Amino acid sequence: MKKRGGRILWLVYLDSSVPRSRGRILPRSKAVSKPTLQEVIQALERLGYRYQVYQDKKYPALWFEERQGYIVVETSEKLRILALKVAEEVRKLRR
């Protein structure tokens, strides 16, 4: 999904505990268990992306979950490629 010249990256896209039917876009083997907004922000900074954070929003299909927020990443890359890079970087941060 695009927003103002960028890609919207919801935490759900990277979360291995969320089924694909609820919004995860990565294979479970490449996804991350319960990523936080701060981890994703650190990963984006390490990867050198420009972004904007929206902390007060919830993913529509999972409106009842506590975790919230999304990030608009300024890139022309496909969303899946971006999500793979970010998930890999989050895994590196957790080591």
UniProtKB/Swiss-Prot annotation:
Per UniProt, the keywords (alphabetical) are:
Cytoplasm, Ribonucleoprotein, RNA-binding, Signal recognition particle
Instruction: Report the Gene3D superfamilies cross-referenced here.
Output: Signal recognition particle, SRP19-like subunit
The keyword Methyltransferase appears for this protein: no
Q: Name one Pfam family in it.
A: SRP19
Report the family membership: Belongs to the SRP19 family.
Subunit structure comment from the entry = Part of the signal recognition particle protein translocation system, which is composed of SRP and FtsY. Archaeal SRP consists of a 7S RNA molecule of 300 nucleotides and two protein subunits: SRP54 and SRP19.
Q: What is this protein called?
A: Signal recognition particle 19 kDa protein
